[in-house]
Amino acid sequence: MDYYSQYPPLGLLKLAKMEERKWNEVRLVRGLSEHLDFVPNKIYITSLFTYSCRPVHQAIEHYHKMFPEAEVNVGGIYATLMPHNIKNQYPFVKIHQGLVSEAENLLPAYYLLNRVDKWKDWKKSIVFTTRGCIRKCPFCVVPKIEGGDEGA
């Protein structure tokens, strides 16, 4: 399974920082890894687009089978817009819709990218200067994820 974006998963990196602040050890794993040198008690899975539902389902099944005792959390655009698709198939999954306010103002844990081949040479930061949007395009997900025109 390939993460379909050239950019790293910013939401997961912010959640990683949030978990580290609670004294939890955090690892970033890309795709379906068969050999992990740790046993997680929480697993976070994200999606960038709704059409990426299949890789999300594959990740849920794969990691739940490997770590049946771990809490599985799914967020991102797919989980926000279509939570019932996940909950109907995987009732054990905790769904998060929208932004995680506790993690919103944290700096992402970019240093975790060093262990992932695709991003090991990542030397950039991603900055959001506003949230929301003043436009009301019928196809756009931004108002559902980030709200209306607050700060835009």
Regions found by a protein language model. Give the residues of each.
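A short, structured N-terminal alpha-helical element that caps or precedes a catalytic domain
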Residues: 1-93
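General structural signal for secondary-structure boundaries
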Residues: 27-30, 109-110, 151-152
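Conserved residues at the C-terminal ends of beta-strands
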Residues: 46, 98, 143
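Short, flexible active-site-adjacent loop segments at beta-strand->alpha-helix junctions, enriched
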Residues: 49, 78, 99-101, 133
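Short catalytic/ligand-binding loop motif for oxyanion handling, primarily in non-cytosolic enzymes
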Residues: 52-53, 80-84, 103-107, 136, ...
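A short acidic Gly-Thr/Ser loop motif
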Residues: 88-91, 101, 130-132
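A charged, well-structured terminal subsegment
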Residues: 97-119
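Radical SAM [4Fe-4S] cluster-binding motif and immediate context
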Residues: 117-152
